[in-house]
Amino acid sequence: LIDKNLLSKIIKRKIKINSVLDLHGCKVNESKTRVVNFIKNNYEMNNRLILIITGKGKRLGVENGWKGKGVLKEVIPQCLNSVLLSRFIIWFDFAPKNMGGEGAILVYLKKTIK
């Protein structure tokens, strides 16, 4: 779990996002591979706060409101919860609206052990 003070600082953008991964246009398998590499690389560089942009899904009729179903926004949280990646992660959740909302995931990584 994440400290409420830290979460407040993240939401208010008082803590800088160290790195961003944009998965727009990627297939599921490619996205999983890119996320694994992104998490591991940022952990090794001791980057703590990162953002993964999944997108919100295809728009199926904007005139009728949002009807998109994003495959990646369903799959990537499962990937982050995996045994392979969970050891690097303290916390993750969908980003606040001012950072992409449900089309992006904020991830707070553990400190690198040296």
Q: How does the language model describe each region?
A:
Residues 1-49, 53-114:
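Long, charged, low-complexity intrinsically disordered regions
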